[in-house]
Design a protein with these regions (language model features):
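N-terminal targeting signals for export/organelle localization
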Residues: 1-30, 162
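Short gly/ser/thr-rich secondary-structure transition/capping motifs
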Residues: 9-10, 30-37, 105-108
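A generic structural signal for alpha->beta connector loops
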Residues: 26, 76-77, 102-103
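Structural microenvironment flanking redox-active thiols in thiol-disulfide oxidoreductases
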Residues: 62-99, 109-116
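Thiol/disulfide oxidoreductase modules built on the thioredoxin-like
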Residues: 96-101, 108-159
């Protein structure tokens, strides 16, 4: 019982993810904009990429969104969106309104892929290396500080690796 009480008092932003340095969960999901197309996580083997879990109903997603658009425009890293437990039409309208930073946005309607990734809530962002290993998990909105001090330096280092 003591473990449960301690666990309930922990801030999920400070709980280390058991997925760090482990293979990213495998998925095959339909594209948001072209539902007849499927993206598989294995499609990204050989490149460093980010997976951003987002939803149109998520207020914090709107807070981080301009930074993701800037990062996408910089060309530093491809960003893939995992649209989480959302309505397709609403999600597409949201991206049209706020900008679409995603190379591809895929749909996790039932949240099963989010569960596989250990999503506590949205937004969450993962940096995945060329071998498909999760190297970083950002719980909550991406911030300028997180980008400058952690995420971008990590991406640049991972891109140098063979």
């Amino acid at each position: 019982a003591a473990f449960l009480l301690v666990g309930l008092t922990l801030n999920p932003r400070q709980v280390p993810s058991p997925l760090i340095d482990k293979p990213a969960p495998v998925f095959q999901l339909n594209h948001l904009h072209e539902p007849e197309k499927v993206m598989a996580s294995q499609d990204n083997l050989g490149k460093v990429w980010m997976l951003n879990v987002w939803a149109s109903w998520c207020v914090a997603c709107r807070d981080e969104h301009p930074l993701l658009v800037q990062l996408a425009n910089s060309g530093i890293v491809p960003i893939y969106g995992l649209n989480y437990k959302d309505e397709r039409t609403t999600a597409m309208q949201w991206l049209k309104r706020y900008g679409d930073p995603y190379t591809i946005s895929i749909v996790d309607q039932d949240g099963k892929v989010g569960i596989d990734y250990g999503v506590y809530g949205v937004p969450e962002t993962y940096v995945i290396d060329k071998k498909g290993i999760i190297r970083h998990k950002q719980i909550g909105p991406v911030t300028v500080d997180a980008l400058q001090k952690t995420i971008i330096p990590l991406i640049l280092e991972l891109q140098k690796q063979v």
